[in-house]
Swiss-Prot record:
Palmitoylated. Residues 1-16 form the signal peptide. Residues 17-529 are extracellular. A lipid is attached at residues 554, 561, 564 (S-palmitoyl cysteine). It comes from Influenza A virus (strain A/Equine/Miami/1/1963 H3N8). Residues 551-565 are cytoplasmic. GO terms for biological process: clathrin-dependent endocytosis of virus by host cell; fusion of virus membrane with host endosome membrane; fusion of virus membrane with host plasma membrane; viral budding from plasma membrane; virion attachment to host cell. This is Hemagglutinin. It is found in: Virion membrane; Host apical cell membrane. Homotrimer of disulfide-linked HA1-HA2. Coiled coil: none annotated. GO terms for cellular component: host cell plasma membrane; membrane; viral envelope; virion membrane. It comes from the Viruses.
Amino acid sequence: MKTTTILILLTHWVHSQNPTGGNNTATLCLGHHAVANGTLVKTITDDQIEVTNATELVQSTSTGKICNNPYRVLDGRNCTLIDAMLGDPHYDVFQYENWDLFIERSSAFSNCYPYDVPDYASLRSLVASSGTLEFMAEGFTWTGVTQNGGSSACRRGSADSFFSRLNWLTQSESSYPTLNVTMPNNDNFDKLYIWGIHHPSTNNEQTKLYVQASGRVTVSTKRSQQTIIPNIGSRPWVRGQSGRISIYWTIVKPGDVLMINSNGNLIAPRGYFKMRTGKSSIMRSDAPIDTCVSECITPNGSIPNDKPFQNVNKVTYGKCPKYVKQSTLKLATGMRNVPEKQIRGIFGAIAGFIENGWEGMVDGWYGFRYQNSEGTLQAGDLKSTQAAIDQINGKLNRVIEKTNEKFHQIEKEFSEVEGRIQDLEKYVEDTKIDLWSYNAELLVALENQHTIDLTDAEMNKLFEKTRRQLRENAEDMGNGCFKIYHKCDNACIESIRNGTYDHDIYRDEALNNRFQIRGVELKSGYKDWILWISFAISCFLICVVLLGFIMWACQKGNIRCNICI
């Protein structure tokens, strides 16, 4: 009976001292927004830290189609750019086209006399960057030879033909005199001349076409000279031909002179291509071209450029995000997330930001919860919320500005003899990608660290601002809450929120209540301890009473206890 009485008294005492139960005190807690399921991001100090909100920075998918706006995209269909430039009869439609981006398809093929270009990648890139196949014919004089040679491998309609931008010269009346032709550049722009040399498949074909047993072609300017001798010999048959043509090119600067000297095997130019400098380029892709708008194009299709990074493709054209290896990089756009605890002690008291965040806040990132004689309420603090949002807004734009540039990363090709150069180029490109990937991860981690630090700082600023207002009228409870030692209704709480609280008005009441409560007050952290202590004492007393009863019964003979050894 005594035990039960002690337990009841202790429990009643603890409940009677519950700080939230009186009308002369109030509890004010400061807290921040939280969500049930946050997003994990990386910072400088943590690989994984949960925040309330984050934005993905890596574009990892494409639209699957190439947009034809705002760039002029030219679909090469079955034609390669070099075939269009040379004037393959099957692709005459491309001869006066302009483009920002020329799309070469994997199905493209040559359909004229078989040829090779020793410096194919450079010529392809040069013509692609010009953005046009604008061609100007010139009056070259070729005396003593037959012009306009053709082949059954290159038909225009039903007749044998040849590349329209080249002139195949052969013997005339069993004679092929030495040719010496000059062509000055009197204009104020660079001129691109395309020429070539024919490699017959047999010696008999050589003498039949050019009389001499071996020809020679020399093309010179003031800055350069190329001398090419044909390689006579049989090669694999292509479109009924075992001979080949090698295509070369020469750029003639303003004021310079083009000189051509040959005694056989010359594939002569018919004029020049006007060179232009620009941002035009070429790309291999099988993605369909559609009517849409996108400033970034990859071989996989167009992609949005509203993110600073992408890992869709290394090859891009336009205003594109930087390519990185990571498939995801998340930028924190919210604060540190600490999900709200569903149960906070046996009395269900409200808790501040030091314990956890608050879910369900709709009127701000930071706010107040309070318990007073009018109940338990919550309100947001717009000023501190706006201060944090203002600093976070623009982070994404700043990251994009640091990374997005108007540039195009073209694909690179090398012939087999340039294998070591290709390996070196690949190593350089891979190193650049590794560096950018590392820089991207570091940049995002730094920004995330800054975001979390500044949101924590705004919370601390609000807490210190409240502490300075309350002064000795309240006590810091250590969990982000204040115990206010005077009656504080909703109007009083509102004055604390908006910064108009006058602590002098409540000072006397607070001091009086503080002294009265101090004598009997138990902090909420000790209530559970007292309950456990009272429970333990009760159990101990019950055990003592039970043991005493057993000993008394044994003494009276009502209970016998035999001990056998």
